[in-house]
């Protein structure tokens, strides 16, 4: 009887402690709302061409991580099919930033023809051109290829959140923003925040695994959203 009573008292005590912790957390959260994001403002010079934001970018991004009102999307591929090594870049996702989840732009829709031509003039060939959720026509209209296309897009890029986009140089993020705005999103809530090469803060995670001269990639570290096109219903 005494053991049972002691057990009950112990359980009640821990319940009170946990309820107190939850109450304090809730009170703190309610009394410390997240600060407003700065209004979008394009950077100057070359960064303006890539539509990189002046206020939220690779130099300031660590100040805006872990926000509950924001989703973070890296729109690079794990292994890009294009010959980026001809520009002294890499095809593989060598590192990413904590809190960002990878959703490749290349699986959302096609690359604009002018971009393909531009890259060809820079000796970069082989951009991904296979299955995509949407088709991009010459008039920049986005036509869904699958019954589930819009549902997937809205899940990955929710309407009720701010969206931070990043990629390797700015173009993939730029194209993603154009697509979202053309379909259903508020342009003022979508930020092209930087190109990863200039990131120098504290939340970078490397995927490179180098043993002597042999390099492999720990893609298992990456929070990656795979789109299984074989399971989707074609229109």
Where would I find each of the regions flagged by the language model?
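Rhodanese-like catalytic fold shared by cysteine-dependent sulfurtransferases
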Residues: 4-62, 66-67, 71, 78-235
